[in-house]
Amino acid sequence: MLGNHLFFIPVLPLFALFSLILKNSWKDILEKAVDPIAICAYGFTIKMALIAALFNSIFGFLITWVITRYEFKGKKFIDAAVDLPFALPTSVAGLTLATVYGNQGWVGRFLKMGNLQIIYTKFGVLLAMIFVSFPFVIRSLQPVLQGLDHGLEEAAWCLGASSFQTFLRVIFPTLVPALVTGFTLSFSRALGEFGSVVMISSNLPLDDLVTSVLIYQSLEQYDYFGASVIGAVILMIALLIIFLINTAQAFYSRR
């Protein structure tokens, strides 16, 4: 019974969203959905979210490997710091990034000497997405890597496999499902980021405007219909991408 009620928690808002949209004609819906500013925002948001998820997958894997396989001073601090983006409100995360990478920030002032700028650019959007979605890959991989049977590695070594061969043929295939899960979660989180992005990007249409900010701008203009259409489109695109990722993962697992 409880499960049935929990099912409606995500379904009811979606039902309300699509009900609001379908009150209008398909012509009006299509006009809002394929607006040049909206199309540019879809593409830019998805591209940045995919790059952020890929970056997090690579470096998240490396960090997970280090904190799981090695003992060193500061290990517990690093392990705890990984969860920092979970604890910070996104607006605080944006303010932190702006403080560090702004023209007068700790890092930004040195970048300015080389005529480099991060905030109010596309790279700033990417940086914000990476920051807020970084922990997902590490927390997805960590329990799997910690629970890995070391006997499998020892057996591979006894059979003459090198360390690289052992990693490639024994360890990595075991980690792939968790890595894909982390990638998917990281992508989903980056795709919907608003608080930090709105503070660190210029939010210019046809440039570095992401869909979450575009939706907010539409709501500020009392264009609830337009905001709903844009939200529904990016939702369906995200579901399609996640479906394709999960399908590829299932195909890999059956091999």
UniProtKB/Swiss-Prot annotation:
This is Probable sulfate transport system permease protein cysT. CDD domains: TM_PBP2. It is found in: Plastid membrane. The keyword ATP-binding does not apply. GO terms for molecular function: ABC-type sulfate transporter activity. One of its GO terms (cellular component) is plasma membrane. It is a multi-pass membrane protein. NCBIfam families: 3a0106s02 (TIGR00969), permease_CysT (TIGR02139). It comes from Prototheca wickerhamii. PANTHER family: SULFATE TRANSPORT SYSTEM PERMEASE PROTEIN, SULFATE TRANSPORT SYSTEM PERMEASE PROTEIN CYST. Part of the ABC transporter complex cysAWTP (TC 3.A.1.6.1) involved in sulfate/thiosulfate import. Probably responsible for the translocation of the substrate across the membrane. Residues 42-246 form the ABC transmembrane type-1 domain. The chain crosses the membrane at residues 2-22, 48-68, 77-97, 118-138, 167-187, 195-215, 225-245. Belongs to the binding-protein-dependent transport system permease family. CysTW subfamily. Keywords: Membrane, Plastid, Sulfate transport, Transmembrane, Transmembrane helix, Transport.
